[in-house]
């Protein structure tokens, strides 16, 4: 699985063993601007300020 791991969308990395989800965190007030991206084993929870989107396809975040 390859996930974007920087704020700029064209940089990606191959996820290590066991981390088979990509995630993207955005501020709820500014949903177009990602604040964090990467690989994860379990989808982080969204909060009052941050929305988290997870997916399992290459570069889907």
Curated annotation (Swiss-Prot):
Disulfide bonds join 3-22, 15-39, 43-54, 55-60. InterPro entries: Cytotoxin_Cobra, Snake_3FTx, Snake_toxin-like_sf, Snake_toxin_con_site, Toxin_cobra-type. It is found in: Secreted. GO terms for cellular component: extracellular region. One of its GO terms (biological process) is killing of cells of another organism. GO terms for molecular function: toxin activity. Gene3D superfamilies: CD59 (2.10.60.10). Belongs to the three-finger toxin family. Short-chain subfamily. Type IB cytotoxin sub-subfamily. This is Cytotoxin 1. It comes from Hemachatus haemachatus.
